[in-house]
Amino acid sequence: MFKFLVLTLGSISCQAYAEDTVIVNDHDISAIKDCWQKNSDDDTDINVIKSCLRQEYNLVDAQLNKAYGEAYRYIEQVPRTGVKKPDTEQLNLLKKSQRAWLDFRDKECELILSNEDVQDLSDPYSESEWLSCMIIQTNTRTRQLQLYRNS
């Protein structure tokens, strides 16, 4: 399944928001591949791989939260209206967008998980696939949020 995920997501070359911003980049996949390859010995317990993926997810989730906070503060400090007050409409849209993205991310990773033999996060292999999806989705959203500041 991991090969399916990497090949599927690795083949996506869509660009969004900016000419040089790729939806899924090599870093997204390389961090996941590193977790699998560093721990791919036959003797390695899948829980070691899962732990590596969990650490990577925690890292990218922290980066996402930082990017969201920076985008929020940017909108507060540089309102699109030119008026020297926070743009509450745009701040509310950012909040709604983030909530909608969280729902999308969860559904997207459920879809990936549906390809597994055991579609339950209590299964370590399924959880590893789910974490891989979460890492890719989170990195993608982080780049999107960073673009809001740079546009």
What are these regions (language model features)?
Residues 1-4:
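Positively charged n-region of N-terminal signal peptides that target proteins for export
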Residues 19-151:
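N-terminal alpha-helical modules
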Residues 11-15:
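N-terminal signal peptide c-region/cleavage motif recognized by signal peptidases
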